[in-house]
Amino acid sequence: MTNPMRSQFDIAWALTSYHFEGLTTEECLWRPATVGLHVHRDPDGEWRADWPDREGYDIGPPSIAWITWHINFWWSMTLDQSFGPGTLTREAVTWPGSADAVRSSGHHLRLGRRPFRAAIGPRRR
């Protein structure tokens, strides 16, 4: 039997990779509605994500760019708080700017999850 947390991690990563694979930048930046969470380029050229003050359906649907940013944000914060100095802030996590960069940052985060993988244990057969 495999370690349940390890199996969940592997499944989550496989699903993420599957959905990121054919993603285009145009799809990421497409807005499904006039209101909703999205990313915006700041004066320094960095892509910043909207951050809602509250949750609710009236906020509108998020763009794919925002969803990919949020995945990156969640994993970055989790790794920093669990295995790093715990000093990372939301403002320091930016959207990478393209679908190719989303895939690259996801791969980088997966490699950065080695401490997480070590903590949940090796795959058992």
Model regions: which residues?
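Low-complexity, Ser/Thr/Pro/Gly-enriched N-terminal "stalk/linker" regions
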Residues: 14-47
